[in-house]
Amino acid sequence: MAKYIMAFDQGTTSSRAIIFDRSGKIIASLNQEFKQIYPKAGWVEHDPMEIWGTQIGVAKGVIEKAGINPEDIAAIGITNQRETTVVWDKNTGKPIYNAIVWQCRRTAPICDELKNKGFDKKIREKTGLVVDAYFSGTKIKWILDNVEGAREKAEKGELLFGNIDTWLIWNLTRGKVHVTDYSNASRTMIFNIHELKWDKEILAELNIPEQMLPEVKPSSYVYGYTDKSIFGVEIPIAGDAGDQQAALFGQACFKPGMAKNTYGTGCFMLMNTGEKAVPSNTGLLTTIAWGIDGKVEYALEGSIFIAGAAIQWLRDELRIIDNSPQSEEYAMKVEDTNGVYVVPAFVGLGAPYWDMYARGTIVGLTRGAKREHIIRATLESIAYQTRDVLEAMQEDSGIRLQALKVDGGASANNFLMQFQSDILGVPVDRPQVIETTALGASYLAGLAVGFWNSREEIEKNWNVDKHFEPAMDNEKREKLYKGWKKAVERAMKWAEE
């Protein structure tokens, strides 16, 4: 009887493999970084062969590290950096170009063209996304337009496209299976999230042949089996979801209105909206959360560009702290920020403002302002930005948030989590296992093979490490938030010519 599930967590900077047991505990984990390629300013690439090599290397290594046999693994679940695009030759299995990474801005001119034609409104309606170089559609077009002979080969059916999940599954099955899941497909900008199929009109506009696209399947499903030559046995590949959606699943956000926030360099916030695709009027993305149990569920997504990165700025540029955990210690030394607000709009502001010309600001300074006040105000800015996004989510969905589940590096900061709860006026829950992305992929795989029987069973695995209850009265909460809104106004449009 197989006792474990293995997750592949293929991220932007590293490939990781984690082995989980039935209670969702980590048995072993292994991680390997790979090369970031920057051919020109604003361009970012990865070598798909290196991604495959590092991912299979950590998978074999983690089995050894855990001291188990490949036969002990019931299934593999895959989660991945979203939007990153690979095009390869069907016959040789070799990529015709490096993977174009989600961060890469090279296709901005193609996006501008779509906007100038007014085609962006159509894309927004059909895919739930804004037209941006971030998503896969324009990256595929760029490869077909710029790699010699690519378009002819694609039209003859000799080329295949995939995001990283598709590329890994194709290699694990030695080319037998060309597939993706609903959550990853919903980030390509060419998938109709209402009709649940590749959109012929968008494909025609971008001149992408449909035969190069993978089949789209549920997120919890046996797609195929690993080729025997890889692990010595055939293991079912049974779960697939983009990283942020996998984290939503790993956090057991199964009901409409449940939300999670991942506090990393930036923040990614997703709210489950159930079987209803909620269009956003506030600059959020409408996306597929997952496809499971014969239906698709949707989410609203908002991203904050600068969160944990603001704490790094205090450490590396201002040098007023020596390490990130120290920020909590200093923030606790003062009762408040003494009227100081920091707006960390270092690269503009994301949802719900979408102001590329906003710049970082410190306001409310007086002669009594100390280092502690600036540090505390920087931490508080992460919580204020989270409230901005959540207010937008509540406005779009009409659903009131009951509690916020948190994960990611900065969720370890107790001061920040308590202030987050205070400023939202809702409880904040930090789980014991914060590797929620890999956990979500494991759950999806385990459900498909009967390792777990239901979402209810999974929910029982979700345990709170720390629960934060709001301790601030409403009058104070609203007064502080009003001050934040004023500070944001001062930061907006600053860099406009």
UniProtKB/Swiss-Prot annotation:
Recorded GO cellular component terms are: cytosol
Among InterPro entries, the record links this protein to: ATPase_NBD, Carb_kinase_FGGY, Carb_kinase_FGGY_CS, FGGY_C, FGGY_N, Glycerol_kin
Sequence positions that bind ATP: T12, T13, S14, T265, G308, Q312, G409
Q: Which residues bind glycerol?
A: R82, E83, Y134, D243, Q244
Q: Name one GO molecular function term.
A: ATP binding
Binding residues annotated for ADP, in chain numbering: T12, R16, T265, G308, G409, N413
Q: Which CDD domains match?
A: ASKHA_NBD_FGGY_GK (cd07769)
What UniProt keywords apply to this chain's record, in alphabetical order? ATP-binding, Glycerol metabolism, Kinase, Nucleotide-binding, Transferase
For this protein, what is the EC number?
A: 2.7.1.30
Highest rank taxon of the organism? Bacteria
Pathway annotation: Polyol metabolism; glycerol degradation via glycerol kinase pathway; sn-glycerol 3-phosphate from glycerol: step 1/1
Name of a matching Pfam family:
FGGY_C
Annotated sn-glycerol 3-phosphate binding sites: T12, R82, E83, Y134, D243
Q: What is the catalytic activity of this protein? A: glycerol + ATP = sn-glycerol 3-phosphate + ADP + H(+)
- What is the activity regulation entry? Activated by phosphorylation and inhibited by fructose 1,6-bisphosphate (FBP).
Q: Enzyme group, top EC level?
A: transferase
Q: Which GO terms describe its biological process?
A: glycerol catabolic process; glycerol metabolic process; glycerol-3-phosphate metabolic process
Which PANTHER family has this protein been placed in? GLYCEROL KINASE, SUGAR KINASE
Similarity section: Belongs to the FGGY kinase family.
How it assembles, according to the record, is:
Homotetramer and homodimer (in equilibrium).
- Say what the protein does: Key enzyme in the regulation of glycerol uptake and metabolism. Catalyzes the phosphorylation of glycerol to yield sn-glycerol 3-phosphate.
Q: Which NCBIfam families match?
A: glycerol_kin, PRK00047.1
Name of the protein this chain belongs to: Glycerol kinase
